[in-house]
């Protein structure tokens, strides 16, 4: 095995990660689109795989792919590829537009107004508006949702304490929780979302790029309960990729979302499919890599490290 192959594969994997996690937004993609395409082709040539799709090791079965409920890295890696929040973080750790333009913020730092991009769609082709974000933010705050990051991402919004029932020092509610008290409101035409904070939060824009702040489709969630995010047919999303196949304990297949519109430059979305192998065992993952089934794995068996560090071409282990 040549280290140049491993390097090329790692490059392809890093590009996929940068597309979904921090790089390649429409505001920064123009200068790197050509180099990305060339790197993808190089990786495909080195590994003998098609540039139109690749396979990576994800890890175990995700505990959940509900943006509001997830707290695991493996789940987040899938969520940030299939969902998109109001804003994104680019490769320079700068906030850039996602589903909305950069917000207008009042002088006192309390009122944040987001203007949605035109023509936004869910993966099922239905319209996505600011009303979907209003629902999703309020769902995050609802105690029944039990979102692990709720207080972190929406706790500074006016009305949050009322939304969660004004808990006492022991965490017991003192009033009936009412998620409608969260001061987040979509305009009647669904074009703008206004968020009123209880106190200034200078980094609220970065919170609006957090995976948990991604929108979920109310009709789908209410019709399917917790199962909405466990099957391709009910997994309605708004990111650059969508789930088209899911075999538990085996694989999840992501395909380009034909209805996607948002912060990513479409020229950066170069892979038609991304197959996520649900493998936790490093030996099984390494075998999948050696057989050509996977082009990127997270780790290798410890006893294989000495042989890999002695690879040809003066390469060094990439892990």
What are these regions (language model features)?
Residues 102-153, 194:
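Aromatic- and charge-enriched surface segment that lines or borders ligand/interaction sites
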Residues 57-107, 236:
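N-terminal lobe/hinge region of extracytoplasmic solute-binding protein
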Residues 179, 197-268, 273:
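Gly/Pro-rich hinge or "lid" segments in bacterial periplasmic/extracellular proteins
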Residues 22-33:
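Bacterial lipoprotein signal-peptidase II cleavage site
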Residues 134, 148-219:
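Surface-exposed binding/hinge segments that line
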Residues 259-307:
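Ligand-site clamp/hinge motif
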Residues 306-319:
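Ligand-binding "clamshell"
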Residues 50-60, 111-114, 133-136, 193-194, ...:
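Short, well-ordered beta-strand elements
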């Amino acid at each position: 095995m040549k280290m140049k192959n491993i390097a090329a594969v790692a490059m392809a994997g890093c590009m996929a990660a940068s597309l979904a996690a921090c790089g390649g937004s429409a505001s920064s993609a123009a200068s790197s689109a050509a180099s990305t395409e060339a790197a993808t082709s190089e990786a495909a040539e080195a590994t003998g795989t098609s540039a139109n799709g690749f396979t990576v090791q994800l890890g175990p079965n995700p505990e959940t792919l509900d943006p509001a409920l997830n707290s695991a890295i493996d789940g987040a890696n899938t969520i940030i590829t299939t969902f998109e929040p109001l804003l994104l973080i680019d490769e320079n750790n700068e906030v850039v537009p996602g589903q909305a333009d950069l917000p207008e913020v009042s002088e006192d730092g309390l009122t944040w107004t987001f203007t949605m991009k035109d023509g936004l769609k869910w993966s099922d082709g239905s319209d996505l508006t600011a009303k979907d974000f209003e629902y999703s933010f309020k769902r995050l705050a609802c105690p029944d949702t039990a979102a692990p990051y709720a207080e972190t991402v929406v706790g500074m919004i006016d009305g949050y304490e009322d939304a969660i029932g004004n808990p006492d020092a022991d965490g017991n509610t003192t009033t009936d929780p009412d998620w409608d008290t969260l001061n987040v409101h979509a305009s009647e035409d669904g074009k703008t979302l206004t968020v009123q904070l209880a106190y200034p939060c200078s980094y609220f824009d970065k919170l609006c790029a957090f995976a948990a702040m991604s929108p979920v489709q109310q009709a789908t969630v209410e019709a399917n309960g917790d199962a909405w995010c466990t099957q391709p047919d009910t997994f309605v999303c708004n990111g650059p990729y969508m789930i088209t196949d899911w075999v538990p304990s085996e694989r999840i297949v992501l395909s380009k979302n034909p209805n996607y519109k948002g912060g990513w430059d479409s020229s950066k979305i170069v892979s038609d499919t991304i197959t996520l192998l649900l493998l936790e065992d490093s030996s099984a993952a390494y075998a999948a890599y050696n057989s050509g089934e996977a082009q990127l794995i997270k780790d290798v068996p410890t006893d294989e490290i000495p042989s890999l560090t002695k690879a040809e071409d003066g390469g060094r282990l990439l892990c």
